[in-house]
């Protein structure tokens, strides 16, 4: 089992998308790389925590390789958007990939370079070692499963399509 942390705007959609993929073992949403211990949603939204809304994704590398995760992630967010995704604006909505295993860094950066070359654009996606992660409040967990009409900037049904690099 491997783990990666993905930030691409509101964490509801990122979780909704990746939870539909074969190879996802479990996930939870929360706040990554916060300057404050165990921040609340309200404090994160104030912009004073330094945290980013993120998905903690545990996955089976044989069924869902990291390259596919990063490729899919980049296909459902706007990697060129600085501090916003869709209608969500603020530093807590910046996009990034946060790794635990050092060996993941080169794979993530390679995938980003391939995306930039293919799209002729410069991504602003952060690629950093995870400093910390705090679980979000219970009402945020699996939000789109519990609230089918909840706002989301990501079409989570795209996860059902066959992946092609």
Curated annotation (Swiss-Prot):
Pfam family, one: PMSR
Domain of life assignment: Bacteria
Catalysed transformations (reactions): L-methionyl-[protein] + [thioredoxin]-disulfide + H2O = L-methionyl-(S)-S-oxide-[protein] + [thioredoxin]-dithiol; [thioredoxin]-disulfide + L-methionine + H2O = L-methionine (S)-S-oxide + [thioredoxin]-dithiol
One BP term from GO: protein modification process
Annotated active site: 10
GO cellular component: cytoplasm
EC number: 1.8.4.11
The entry's keywords: Oxidoreductase
Entry-linked Gene3D superfamilies: Peptide methionine sulphoxide reductase MsrA
HAMAP family: MsrA (MF_01401)
UniProt similarity note: Belongs to the MsrA Met sulfoxide reductase family.
Function: Has an important function as a repair enzyme for proteins that have been inactivated by oxidation. Catalyzes the reversible oxidation-reduction of methionine sulfoxide in proteins to methionine.
Protein name: Peptide methionine sulfoxide reductase MsrA
């Amino acid at each position: 089992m491997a783990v990666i942390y993905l930030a691409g705007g509101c964490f509801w959609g990122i979780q909704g998308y990746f939870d539909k993929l074969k190879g996802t073992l479990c996930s939870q949403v929360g706040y990554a790389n916060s300057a404050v211990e165990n921040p609340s949603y309200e404090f994160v939204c104030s912009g004073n925590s330094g945290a980013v809304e993120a998905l903690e994704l545990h996955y089976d590398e044989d069924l869902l390789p990291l390259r596919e995760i990063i490729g899919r992630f980049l296909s459902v967010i706007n990697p060129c958007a600085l501090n916003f995704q869709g209608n969500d604006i603020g530093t807590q909505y910046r996009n990034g990939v946060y790794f635990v295993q050092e060996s993941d860094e080169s794979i993530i950066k390679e995938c980003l370079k391939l995306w930039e070359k293919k799209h002729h654009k410069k991504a602003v996606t952060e690629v950093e070692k995870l400093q910390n992660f705090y679980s979000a409040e219970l009402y945020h967990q699996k939000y789109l499963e519990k609230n089918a009409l909840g706002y989301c900037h990501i079409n989570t049904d795209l996860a059902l399509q066959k992946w092609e690099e």
